[in-house]
Amino acid sequence: MYFVNLLTTIIPILLAVAFLTLLERKFLGYMQLRKGPNIVGPYGLLQPITDAVKLFIKEPLQPLTSSLILFIIAPTLALTLALMMWIPLPMPHPLVNMNLSILFMLALSSLAVYAILWSGWASNSKYALIGALRAVAQTISYEVTLAIIILSVLLMNGSFTLSTLITTQEHIWLLLPSWPLAMMWFISTLAETNRAPFDLTEGESELVSGFNVEYAGGPFALFFLAEYANIIMMNALTTILFLGAHNNSLFPEMYTTNFMLKTLLFTTFFLWIRASYPRFRYDQLMHLLWKNFLPLTLVMCMWHITLPIILASIPPQT
């Protein structure tokens, strides 16, 4: 039975990822005053299926000088971790109800760095290695702010469990009292998922394609699936943390619809940013975090710690 539950979580995620690629291509097409994919099926709706078939029937080539085992393990690990991060998300019920679900997600997002590093190193290509090192530095750096922002939100939530955020946001979204945190969180998620304008790992002009330059066919598709699964997951987490989908007791079945609509809104915002903004320079990317976001998030965290203590000393107002 548990295996069936796992499949009913994984298959919709993979389908969502497939159609997110179509949505992105359509979105970029219309932003650039063209149609986007519109040949395969009505309005190009079958494009993701043909893409998947094409990629998985291609021969998975690897360089002769590559480290074969790591070369194959890296994309598999990337997708496995991307799918595992969906386990504790309440939609409205998580697959596994954990007490420390936030810590579990932080630990898994840190492990995702290894997949990128191994893929770059095992390819035995200088472009792939430079791309991987950039990705690792960027991901590790932005995880610092993500962790501090999550800590600030959890101080308001009073628990490490994601499910309790639904109760916390019953009357007001946490986005409203903590909008500076939400803005920094959203920008950090862009950097964490290596999306434009922070897609320095894939700098076509200088690094060809980044850490996955030597991958073709199936293994490349696994990296692609992992990246887009992470994007949807990060937006789902943003929705849970800041735009808690209200669990209406009259229409409890509307929770998931509400939740997915907000996640789709954030994901579309990701695509809009990609179509609108140019890429950051690497030093600007690091300065943004270490000189701007880190001091700000630390101040906000201290504020969320001191506020309850200050208010606790006020006598009850009658």
Swiss-Prot record:
Residue ranges of the TM segments: 3-23, 68-88, 102-122, 146-166, 171-191, 222-242, 253-273, 294-314
Signal peptide start and end residues: none
UniProt cross-references to InterPro entries, sorted A to Z: NADH_UbQ_OxRdtase_su1/FPO, NADH_UbQ_OxRdtase_su1_CS
Any one of the GO BP annotations: aerobic respiration
Cellular localization per UniProt: Mitochondrion inner membrane
EC number: 7.1.1.2
Catalytic activity: a ubiquinone + NADH + 5 H(+)(in) = a ubiquinol + NAD(+) + 4 H(+)(out)
Single GO cellular component term: mitochondrial inner membrane
MF terms (GO), sorted A to Z: NADH dehydrogenase (ubiquinone) activity
Membrane topology: Multi-pass membrane protein
Record keywords: Electron transport, Membrane, Mitochondrion, Mitochondrion inner membrane, NAD, Respiratory chain, Translocase, Transmembrane, Transmembrane helix, Transport, Ubiquinone
EC primary class: translocase
Pfam families found in the cross-reference section: NADHdh
Family as reported in the entry's similarity comment: Belongs to the complex I subunit 1 family.
Functional summary from the UniProt entry: Core subunit of the mitochondrial membrane respiratory chain NADH dehydrogenase (Complex I) that is believed to belong to the minimal assembly required for catalysis. Complex I functions in the transfer of electrons from NADH to the respiratory chain. The immediate electron acceptor for the enzyme is believed to be ubiquinone.
Protein name: NADH-ubiquinone oxidoreductase chain 1
Source species taxonomy: Eukaryota, Metazoa, Chordata, Craniata, Vertebrata
Name of the gene this protein is made from: MT-ND1
